[in-house]
């Protein structure tokens, strides 16, 4: 359904992005940020799901600045490699790539951002720093409590799992206390409840979070 295109960030860096064009009535543009494993088939599936609902979706290859076409599996060795790459990528450079995606989509209408795990953390920072966003929805971003100094500049929603060992409920409460204006939802689920890993996936939590996300988009993505 989708294709890979190349975009150029403000600093001249050229990167790949998976593009899934909307089906049916157009609802706006959506930047979807990868998990720490790269723009994997699972991430492309998520892009396609949102495209089927009417969104033009772009998912930037955040790691292209360090390693082109980087994609990792779920075993411990692969996780360690992906964590190292995320650390090398930092924050400033990914924000430039995300801004380029927003600018590309913005010519056609309102743009939102969503992301999962590593991408959920980048969504939080993007909500504060990226220009032109109508709203932001982050899923189980583990690093959000470390970046509470970032002030979202657009309406922001966050989703977490109550049984997420990497994001204890005390961390979720910390976010609530620091940013009471943010719309936070907690589901009876593990970390990565939208992922394709059977031990993490929750059909019920994914569906409930999606319904809230789509309602949030409908409210805030006004041309």
Predicted regions mapped to residue ranges:
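N-terminal cap/leader regions of alpha/beta-hydrolase-fold enzymes
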Residues: 1-223
């Amino acid at each position: 359904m989708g294709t890979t295109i190349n975009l150029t960030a403000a600093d001249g860096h050229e990167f790949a992005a998976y593009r899934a064009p909307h089906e049916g009535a157009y609802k706006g543009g959506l930047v979807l940020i990868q998990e720490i494993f790269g723009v994997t088939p699972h991430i492309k599936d998520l892009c396609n799901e949102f495209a089927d609902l009417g969104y033009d979706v772009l998912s930037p290859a955040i790691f292209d600045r360090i390693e082109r076409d980087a994609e990792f599996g779920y075993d411990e060795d692969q996780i360690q490699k992906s964590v190292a790459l995320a650390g090398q990528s930092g924050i400033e450079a990914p924000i430039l790539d995300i801004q380029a995606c927003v600018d590309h989509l913005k010519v056609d209408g309102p743009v939102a951002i969503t992301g999962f795990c590593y991408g959920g953390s980048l969504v939080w920072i993007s909500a504060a720093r990226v220009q032109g966003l109508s709203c932001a929805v982050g899923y189980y971003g583990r690093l959000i409590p470390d970046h509470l100094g970032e002030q979202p500049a657009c309406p922001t929603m966050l989703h977490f799992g109550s049984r997420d060992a990497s994001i204890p409920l005390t961390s979720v409460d910390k976010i609530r206390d620091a940013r009471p204006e943010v719309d936070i939802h907690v589901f009876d689920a593990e970390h990565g409840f939208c992922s394709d890993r059977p031990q993490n996936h929750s059909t019920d939590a994914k569906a409930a979070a999606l319904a809230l996300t789509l309602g949030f988009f409908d409210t805030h993505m006004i041309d």
